[in-house]
Each structure stands twice: as C-alpha cells, then as structure tokens.
Amino acid sequence: MACVTTVGLGVIFFLFRVFSSGYTHMSICTPGFELEEFVFKVHRNHLHSGKRLGKVTFNNCDGRTRTLFQSIDKRFEINTDGTVTLKRQVTLHEGHKVFSVHAWDSSGMKHTASVRVERVPAQVESSSDVDLTKNKRVKRGWIIPPISVSENSKGPFPMRLVQIKSDYAIETRLAYKITGEGADLDPKGIFTIDRLSGWVSVTQLLDREKKASYKLRAHANGVDADVTEKPMDIIVTVTDQNDNKPVFTQNPFNGNVPEALEKGEVFMTVTATDADDKENTDNADISYVIISQDPPSPKPNMFAINPVSGGISVLEKGLDREQWFRYTLVITATDMNGEGLSTTGTAVITVTDSNDNAPLFEQSSYTASVPENQVGVEVAKLPVTDGDEPESTAWSTKYQIIAGDKGGFFNISTGPSRLEGIITTVKPLDYEKTKQYILSVIVVNDDKFVGPLPTSTATVTVNVKDVNEPPEFIPKEKFISRPENLPVGSNLIPFTAIDPDTEKKQNITYRIGNDPSDWLNITGSGQIQVKNALDRESSNVKDGKYKALILALDNDVESPATGTGTLVIELQDVNDNAPVINERTIKLCNRESAPVLLSITDKDLPPFAGPFKVEPQGDTSKNWSVFFNETGHFLNIKPQSQLEQGEYKVVLRVADREGESQENIIQASVCDCKGEAFQCTDKQVAGIPLFGVLGVLGGILLLLLLALLLLMFLRRKSNSKKEPLLPEDDVRDNIYYYDEEGGGEDDQDFDLSVLHRGLDNRPEVFRNDVAPTFMPAPQYRPRPANPEEIGTFIDDNLKAADNDPTAPPYDSLLVFDYEGGGSDAGSLSSLNTSSSGNDQDYDFLNEWGPRFKKLADMYGGGED
C-alpha cells in the first residue's frame, strides 16, 4: 500500500513537472505580426478614398492594443489599431496590389509584414445552395484563386501554381486550356495547364524586371457533353526578389560648395536607381552613406548625406578654399533601406570662394596735384590686393569716397585690372576757392563679406594748381529790351566781366565776338553802344531777339585767356515798315471776271499793322475797283468795265493803322476771255491794235516783192554781159613773192562778185579733160545784203561748187607727184636749165581761158 502510494505521488509529481514545464514554455511571447501576409479582397479595381480594406494584427506581448504602424505605400493609411484605409483613390491595374507594413514593438524593434489587396469576382451562388428540385437554370462561374509566382524560383519545373475549375465540372467532365501571353503568345510556353485537372504550371524561371505580370485567358469545354464555359481572364503576378543592386545615375558626381556655406545646407544631391519593385517591396528602397572623405581636413567628417534623398550638406565649419579647394567622398547606396545589396560611387566637391578676405590698399596715403578748371583729369590710382579667387566677385573691387568731397568734385571708379581705384575730376576745381582737398576712400568687394571683416581705408591729398582763368561775365547771358529805332551812338547797357584770378591783378579789355548784323560797338569799359541802325525785321532777329557774343580778354603774359558773354536784345517794334501787297502779277478775263484776291503783309507787329487802307493812284481809280473782302484781311481787285486785251499797271497805295504807306505796282494781264477761263488769243500783240498788225505785215510783203523784182533784174542784166566780171587785181591772179620774210596772207582780198554770180553763168569756163555727165547745174545763193550772213553764204556756195561738174581744174583732184610725159607744164627742173625765158613756149596759156589771161599776157607773147 505504501508502495502504491509512493508510485502515485511520483506520477503526480511527474505530471506536475510536465504541466509546469509546458506552462512555462507556453508563457514565452515574441512580439510580431500574427501573419506574414495579410490578404484583403475587394470586388472592383477602382477603390475610392476612405475605403476600409481590413485590419492587420500585431502582438506587442505587453497587453497594448495600439501599435505604431507605417505603410511603405503612402496611399494606404494604417491606424494604431491596425485598420487599413485608403488615403486617396487607388486603381488595381493588375487586379492586385502588394505593399509592406512596418510596426515597432515596445523595445523599438521594427517588424515587417506584407499586405495584399486583390480583386475577386462577386460571390456567386455555389452548387450546394442550388435547389435541384426546382426547374431553374443556375448561373455558372469559374473558381480561380489568385495566382502569383516568385521570380528566380528554382523549381523544380514544371511547377504547379493553382488549380482552376468551372462549375460545369459538377455536371460533366471538362477539358481546360489557357491562351495569351506566356501560353500560345510570345513568350510562348511559359505557362501550361493540365487538360483535365485544371492545374496551371510554370515551366521556367521568371524575371520580374523583364515582365512583371502575364495576362492569360482560361477556357473550359465539355468532354462528354456540348458544354462551353465563358472564357475567364487570369492575371499571373511575378513577385519581386531582391536580385538587383542599386546603380548610381552618374559616377562621379560633381558639385560646388561655397566655403562659407552654413551648416546643414544642402549643396548637391547624389541619386541611384534600383530595378527591383519599389511599390510593393522595399527591395528598391535605397539608403545612402558616406564611407570616406579625402582629404580628412580640417575634420574627417566635414559633410553629411541624407540617407533617403542623397542630399549632401555641410556638417562642420572650417572649409577654406585657399587650403583645401577639393574633396572626394566615397558613398554607398544600399537597397532594402540599407540592409540589402549595395554599390559604391564617388562625389567630387569643389570648394568655391567666399568673400572671406577683405581687399587692402597697398598704401594708406596718397598725394596728387591737379590743375584747376579741368574735368575728367585723372587724379590718382589706388592699387589694392585681395586674397580671394582671382576674377571672382569676391576678388573684384569697388570704391567709395566717404569724406572730403562735399561739393562732389571727384569720382572714383574701378580700373581695368579690377584691383585699383581711379580718382578723376567731375567738376572744375577753383584754386581761388579751395587750394587743397583731403579725401577718404574705402574699398570693398562686389560680393558681400562673409562674417565681420575690416574695411581698408586710404587718404588722398589733392593739391589744386593755379592756372590763368578767363574773365567771367556775370551773368553769362544778359537780357535787355530796347526800341529798334534807337539812334546810332546810343548806349545800350554796360556788360562787364570780372577776373577770377584775384591774385594776379590783371586788366580786362572788351571786344565784339559775333555781331551778325554789325549793329553794336563796345568801349574799353564794357559799355555797349549802337553802331548801326537796329531793325527788328532783320533776318538775324529770331522771335524778336538779337544775340551778340561779347569777349573779355585779360593781359596775362604767359597764357592770356578770353571769356565770353552773350547779350540778348529784345527789339521793341516801331512803325517803320509800310504794308506790302504780296501778289505783283495777276491775270484775268475782261468779261465777267471774278475779283482777284490779293494779300497784304506788314513786317511790323500790331498795333502798327492792320487794319489797312488802300487808295488807287492815277488812272487805276478809273479802270479798277479795289475793296476788302468780308474778313478784312484780303484785298479784291477787278476791272470796273470791259478792258481791251493787254498789259496794265495797277498802282495802289496801302497804308497801315498809323498811316505808314507806300505805292504797290501790280502788273495785270487782261485777256479777251470770259469768266475764270483765262486764255489769251492773238487778237493783240504787245498791245498793238489789229489794224496796226495788218499794216506791218503788208509792209513786209511789199519789201519782199521789191527785193524779188530787183533780183530778177540783176540776173537778166548779168546774162547780157560777155566778159566776166573779174577785177584786175583778183586774189587768184596776183603774183606773190614768197621770198619776202615777214609777209602774211592777204586773207581779206576776195571778190564777192565771183561767188555771187556762180560758175554756171560763165560759158567761157569749161573743162576739156572730163566727159560731161549731163547733171543739172547747181543753184548758187545770191550775195546777202547783211554782212553778218557772209559766212553762211560762202559755206552754201562752196558746197554747191563742190558738186558742180563744170567747175574749173583747181577744184578737181590733182596728182602732184606725177611729172611724166604728156604734161604741158613739164618738169619744174626745166626752169633752172633754161638760159632765158624765151626758150619756153607759153602760147598754150591762151587756151586756158580768161581765168589765166593775166598769165598768158605776161609769158605768152601776147599783149602786155
């Protein structure tokens, strides 16, 4: 009995230990999601904002019901109780959506689970719910679970994925097949289906980066019965695996950082990409880290990088371009938020200059001398130095005069080198007023200083040099008003100048510089007088004002100077001009003519001008009517009665308001016409009546008739003469002695009667060496009565003689170089060989006609 009791106690103790140990083991709790993947099913592809999808559960092991969740896809929001809702509208393009969810337990450890939102068909009535006793057709449907396959799966292949079925399979045997991309379309053969069971299998390894999903279509047909199921689309989703490293978009990255950039400011960004799924997984979530910095000065961690964005910023102060102008950073990009695959890149950072060095003048003081009265003169150049980067805005300089130039006489500008200030004068300096200027000049950069920097200052002492200045008229332009009828010699006004060189005690003399009308004179004391009569109506007077240039000259020995002043005389008008009619010639008809409008001008101004008065003078008042038009500014003139055609002088005396007048003569051409159609005929010529014209024409005709009768008489008388009218001393029959030196041509000894009669009226003139051509004899002009026409007369008769076939031999072409046989004249050498004149026989000269009678009488043995 004791033994049984002992055994019983041992069993009880053993059971207690077992249960106690089991209880202890069961009491250990591990925080985490209750599922690795939560699936939420929806019945449509378009999900609206605010829709509640489901709930994820997380065990904290501390009894808390609320947990901090974070969705990788920002379109989904997870409350602390695990409820998943949509923040904005989502469309399931592939029929599903997968994203990651993070949760943190009480110790701060992060946990991750997947959430899958997939579309499923609306719930259809299953075959178990159909009342077979009712004679009703039941709507059929497919049973297709979601299909997903992980990329890079190693099989074995073919690897079953899911089994699809149709409700017709309850009634009859079905044969299944699939079509679409990956089945019978490229890429072909990736997916297959068992014809009778409906198992869908994949035949090879898939790559999501090449194709993330495949769209198939399922078909079912009856084997034993004529049954065909409506085709159904199937989406096969390839889930991502982290099989791609991040890749930097460029390598290296280049950036610039100002040496005075504040801490935390981002100045450049590096980026990398990952081909893995970024929407549904964290396989493409990249984290950036700086691995090394070269040079590690002044501190090894001068820069920081944002792990998510890749933005690089300044972490520590101390960048100095003058010491370390470039840094090289080695950066890694790791996916899965820094826990996956990684790659390495480089960022090259160039430190750009900041204005941390103030420009400094090379000297603290300068001295310069400038002559007075000169503008634009360079006073001094102030060179500076700057330790910043050359040609940068932190290096180039600008200047300012801060003291010593209250009058604004100087300007300072940056020189071509951009490291010098150039002071110039912008106003003329006056030695007599200020002999010395002390200027304070500062220099700064175009860019602002970084931090508090001292400003360099220089002092410039400018000494003004005295030069001889021209006398100055005060005022430089003087206005006076005087009447234009001032008598010659009258004083107008004293116009004097002062010498600004008060220390020299110089004398000033005056001259007239420019006096266009020569009206003025100036005395040695500067008194301006009237030299010639003034005239306000002169062309040199503009707007009633006359300007003259006055000169003032000093007597400096080295460099005498001349000052100028302008005298403006406003001439007051007086009545010294009579009115004038502008139109001096008019034309009008003598019948029904409209009045001719005349305008009157007066050089004088009111009240010395209009209204005007007009008085016809002499016979004008008898033949012409003169009156003003309705405006009173224009004068109308017309004949009082019908006048004969001709030229008339119309004399009008025009007077102004004060009676200043003068006569105006208007030449009026009157034509025998009507109205305004002015057109003259030949009825009158130069004012001579018609009968006078006829008388003149008759006299001319009578004179022409008498001249014709006289000419006929002379021709008849000339035909009755037997002997030619050749004077004894005809120029062509004279013997000239050419051995007389100094003798001239008697070019005035010609017989006009020979030219007058013509050769055709002299029957004794003939040629026996030319056959007659029976051409009509030319007609020669008679001798003109007017001696001035002799030239024309000779030219015309010369042309007629050239064409006359009966012209004498001296008018024909002679060949003088032929002296052969048959020539009656023989050779000229015979004149020398003959012993006397009797050896020659000159009887043939008698045959040459009367033109050679004189020669025949001398040598032919005839009468003396």
From Swiss-Prot:
Modified residues (Phosphoserine): 753, 823, 829
Residues bearing PTM Phosphotyrosine: 736-738
PROSITE patterns linked to this entry: CADHERIN_1 (PS00232), CADHERIN_2 (PS50268)
Membrane protein topology class: Single-pass type I membrane protein
Protein location: Cell junction, Adherens junction; Cell membrane; Endosome; Golgi apparatus, trans-Golgi network
Keyword Transmembrane attributed: yes
UniProt GO cellular component terms: adherens junction; catenin complex; cell cortex; cell-cell junction; cytoplasm; endosome; Golgi apparatus; membrane
Signal peptide bounds: 1-22
Tissue: Expressed in the skin and the ovary (at protein level).
Sites marked Cleavage: 714-715, 733-734
UniProt keywords, alphabetically: Calcium, Cell adhesion, Cell junction, Cell membrane, Cytoplasm, Endosome, Glycoprotein, Golgi apparatus, Membrane, Metal-binding, Phosphoprotein, Repeat, Signal, Transmembrane, Transmembrane helix
One Pfam family this sequence matches: Cadherin
Protein's GO biological process: adherens junction maintenance; adherens junction organization; calcium-dependent cell-cell adhesion via plasma membrane cell adhesion molecules; cell adhesion; cell migration; cell migration involved in gastrulation; cell morphogenesis; cell-cell adhesion
Residues annotated to bind Ca(2+) 1: 243
Residues exposed to the Extracellular side: 23-692
Oligomer status and interactors: Interacts with ctnna1 and jupa during early stages of oogenesis, interactions are no longer present when the oocyte develops into the unfertilized egg. Interacts with ctnnb1 during oogenesis and in the unfertilized egg.
Protein name: Cadherin-1
Source species: Danio rerio
